[in-house]
Swiss-Prot record:
Subunit structure, as described in the record: The potassium channel is composed of a homo- or heterotetrameric complex. Interacts with dnj-1; dnj-1 chaperone promotes tetramerization.
GO CC annotations, alphabetized: monoatomic ion channel complex; plasma membrane
Region spans: Disordered: 1-76, 601-674
Protein name: Potassium voltage-gated channel unc-103
Segments of skewed composition (Low complexity): 640-650
Provenance organism: Caenorhabditis elegans
Gene name as annotated: unc-103
Transmembrane residue ranges: 124-144, 159-179, 204-224, 235-255, 262-282, 355-375
Length: 829
């Protein structure tokens, strides 16, 4: 058997999902909150007017143009184009979301807070703050005394002094820039950008001005004339005020807390920075007690390194360990203390050192728990996907073990779970979108199904609203190789669109009927059938497949909401393989023919009943009532039963006079049998109700007389009522004769069938004997071949969509000679 391959490229002409050249995909409109003056929407390509959906650019109202408006439009457009690129780099916490961006009237010499210049400037200030956080405590504890001694000789000769001066200047400039930088008014519902200089100054004074001003004061320049030790210590303490800027930096860096690696890096940097500060304080305590105490930790270090301090006449000791050794030892002691290790080779000896060590232990325990607890949480979050995968897999295996799932089903379950997890990473899209509004869900679904809706010709010409409604009802399914998507006999509840992979269509004996690939469609067209059909084939995945499925009811609901699109959809939809089982329509047609055959036999009995035409008419009417009840619902059947019991008291009041020849076999009727059947059913129902019946002349094969009118006759009805008892008796006799006739006919058919089967078995045995003997003379035995005797044909129409058995004939078998072409055949209903 040849295999039909229906897969084709999406760009091939005639492909069911090949989009025509005129099909364009319309993206969803961008959300814009209402404002007092203008209402514009921003797309990724530029700033466009409201009603537009244009190609970018700012579209203003007529009369509002001019060079000034054009310059403002170009400036706003340039700024907006850089917002997406600088959104991650910007440190401002008040960066507007892109869909809320509004073109504002920028004051002269005012800096927009989301401009590229402001983003770069914030990063420069961040680096200077980090430099200040590291070197300010170090200089105040280790180098301030040496720098003061050098300053007595000459100013600004040391590199650190020059760098500190530059940092002070940059902080002062940052204050000036903050007075000219816009901000977002969070108290306003519209979240407008404020560019008025007065409002900006008021907002800055209420915010970070005091902290920035204290951090920018050059205290070492203000106290340069004093040379006492107390002044030097005061300068060191005041210079640490620059660390207040870290609060502002920490607030801005909070926007990166969603990135696990960034948070891990920030936590480790924070831990190291605090240890650095504690090391500077630890050295400052030992250095302050060095002149009047001889058993500080610095003295112990000098003895261990054999580098003692020297002092004359109570002055500050000189010499001792190098600066590098002092800093490394201080940092070593603080880290061993806050991590609760404490080797003991460096220990506190004085009371001040012991008090600070106690404070450092308490602080270290809290910091250790918080920092490393967060580190554990971050690492666990990094591997949360793997943990969830193993958890779900364990649950699946427990389910298989508890319910004793057989191995084939177990393998299919595990393969599907692994494939679905690798495709979705364990994320349930329905659960994610559940908490969002319908409009946003529609936009997301439209984005996820954009390739299907824009590439399939069936959706060409649909409105954006119709596409949004369709995208909300599509469901994506994933299938591993070998998984059966549809079984034979399943209800066809949906329409399938193949997005990736290939499937095969199989019949009952696993014969491949077709192979479908990307952009193919299978199922049934719900617009062509009133009732849900059943699948006539099995559909099995050949490779890993991704399919878009829409339920029949959901599709019909959308087409009901958009009736103008229904005709276009039905016209453009090309189903690659129709799975509908046409045997359903065949059975319905057979039931209809059986009813018509009953009516045909009833008409025959009506004209051949000899005793009394009135009683024959009554029998016809009673039989017509039973035929009318065959296609009614249970309620109508109960009502008909009630009317039948009441009609026994009053015989029919109508007479039917018509002539007709013997009925022609039903399966030999002409091509116009549908119109004849409908007319016959209408006549039967009308006659059962006692109304006037008009019988139309039939087509070839029947000899019913032309139009015959039936009128009620009061006199004749009175005569019939007088003979009601005789009518009941004749009616019982008529049905008894009918039953005997049917039984005898069935017995003849059974005998004939048995005889034919015996003859067929005999011929098959003779054929096998001849074949075993190896006889080469075939002409004498040709008459005994079963293929020559059996002439059975089931002819189906050549049209698509299955069909109905038009004629079924079984030739009469003979035990002696095959039938001739002119021999009469029996028709079996």
């Amino acid at each position: 058997m040849k295999t039909a391959v229906f897969g084709r490229d999406s760009g091939e002409p005639g492909s069911p999902c090949g989009a025509p050249p005129s099909l364009t995909f319309t993206p969803p409109a961008t959300l814009v909150p209402p404002t007092h003056h203008h209402s514009r929407s921003t797309n990724r390509g530029g700033v466009s007017g409201t009603g537009g959906g244009g190609s970018g650019g700012l579209q203003g109202a007529p009369g509002a143009g001019g060079p000034r408006a054009s310059h403002s439009s170009r400036r706003t457009s340039r700024l907006h184009n850089n917002v997406s690129a600088l959104g991650v780099l910007s440190l401002g916490a008040d960066v507007l979301p892109e869909y809320k961006l509004q073109p504002t009237r920028i004051h002269h010499c005012t800096i927009v807070h989301y401009s590229p210049f402001k983003a770069v400037w914030d990063w420069i200030i961040l680096l200077l703050v980090i430099y200040t956080a590291v070197f300010t405590p170090y200089v105040a504890a280790f180098l301030l005394r040496e720098l003061q001694d050098t300053a007595k000789k000459s100013r600004f000769t040391e590199p650190l002094e020059i760098v500190d001066l530059i940092v002070d200047i940059m902080f002062i400039v940052d204050i000036i820039i903050n007075f000219r930088t816009t901000y977002v008014n969070e108290n306003d519902e519209a979240c407008q950008v404020v560019s008025d200089p007065g409002k900006i100054a008021t907002h800055y004074f209420k915010g970070w001005f005091i902290i920035d001003m204290v951090a920018a004061v050059p205290f070492d320049l203000l106290l340069v004339s004093t040379n006492s030790d107390e002044t030097t210590t005061l300068i060191g303490l005041l210079k640490t005020a620059r660390l207040l800027r870290l609060v502002r930096v920490a607030r801005k860096l909070d926007r990166y807390s969603e990135y696990g690696a960034a948070v891990l890096l920030l936590l480790m940097a924070t831990f190291a920075l605090i240890a650095h500060w504690l090391a500077c304080i630890w050295y400052a305590i030992g250095s302050a007690e060095l002149s009047h105490k001889e058993y500080t930790w610095l003295h112990q270090l000098s003895k261990q390194l054999a580098q003692p301090y020297t002092s004359t006449n109570g002055t500050i000791p000189t010499g001792g360990p190098t600066l590098k050794s002092r800093y490394v030892t201080s940092l070593y002691f603080t880290l061993s203390t806050i991590t609760s290790i404490g080797f003991g080779n460096v220990s506190a000896t004085t009371d001040s050192e012991k008090i600070f060590t106690i404070i450092m232990m308490i602080l270290g325990s809290l910091m250790y728990a918080s920092v490393f607890g967060n580190v554990s949480a971050i690492i666990q979050r990094l591997y949360s996907g793997t943990a969830r995968y193993h958890t779900e897999m364990s649950r699946l295996r427990e389910f298989i073990r508890f319910h004793q799932i057989p191995n084939p089903l177990r393998q299919r379950l595990e393969e599907y779970f692994q494939h679905a997890w690798s495709y979705t990473n364990g994320i349930d899209m329905n659960l994610v979108l559940k908490g969002f509004p319908d409009c946003l869900q529609a936009d997301i679904c439209l984005h996820l199904n954009r390739n299907l809706l824009s590439g399939c010709a069936a959706f060409a010409g649909s409105t954006p609203g119709c596409l949004r409604a369709l995208s909300m009802r599509f469901r994506t399914t994933h299938s591993p190789p070998g998984d059966t998507l549809v079984h034979r006999g399943d209800i066809l509840t949906g329409l399938y669109f193949i997005a990736r992979g290939s499937v095969e269509i199989l019949n009952d004996d696993n014969t491949v009927m077709g192979i479908l690939g990307k952009d193919d469609i299978f199922g049934e067209n719900p617009l062509l059938y009133d009732e849900v059909g059943k699948s006539s084939c099995n559909v099995r995945a050949l490779t890993y497949c991704d399919l878009h499925k829409i339920l029949r009811d959901d599709l019909l609901d959308v087409l009901d909401m958009y009736p103008e699109f229904a005709e276009t959809f039905c016209k453009n939809l090309t189903i690659t393989y129709n799975l509908r089982d046409d045997a359903q329509s065949l059975r319905k047609k057979f039931d209809r023919h059986k009813l018509l055959r009953m009516s045909s036999s009833m008409n025959k009995d009506r004209y051949t009943t000899p005793p009394d035409g009135d009683h024959g008419n009554a029998a016809v009417r009673r039989s017509a009532e039973s035929v009318s009840r065959c296609d009614s619902n249970p309620i109508d059947r109960r009502q008909s039963a009630g009317s039948r019991s009441s009609s026994r008291c009053s015989p029919p009041h109508a007479a039917l006079t018509a002539t007709r020849s013997e009925a022609t076999p039903l399966l030999r009727r002409s091509t116009n049998h549908h119109e004849e059947d409908d007319a016959l059913f209408d006549d039967i129902r009308a006659f059962a109700r006692g109304n006037t019946v008009t019988m139309s002349p039939t087509v070839a094969g029947n000899s019913v007389s032309p139009t015959t009118a039936i009128h009620n006759d009061g006199i004749h009805s009175q005569q019939l009522s007088d003979r009601s008892d005789d009518y009941e008796e004749r009616r019982a006799n008529m049905f008894g004769r009918r039953l005997e006739s049917i039984e005898s006919q069935m017995e003849r058919m059974q005998n004939k069938f048995n005889s034919d089967m015996e003859t067929l078995i005999k011929l098959v045995k003779e054929q096998s004997i001849i074949r075993n003997n190896g006889s080469s003379n075939e002409e004498p035995n040709a008459r005994y071949r079963p293929n020559n005797y059996i002439s059975s044909a089931i002819r189906l129409p050549n049209g698509g969509g299955g069909g109905v058995v038009d004629e079924m004939r079984v030739s009469r078998l003979s035990s002696h000679e095959p039938p001739t072409p002119t021999q009469e055949t029996d028709t079996i209903l």
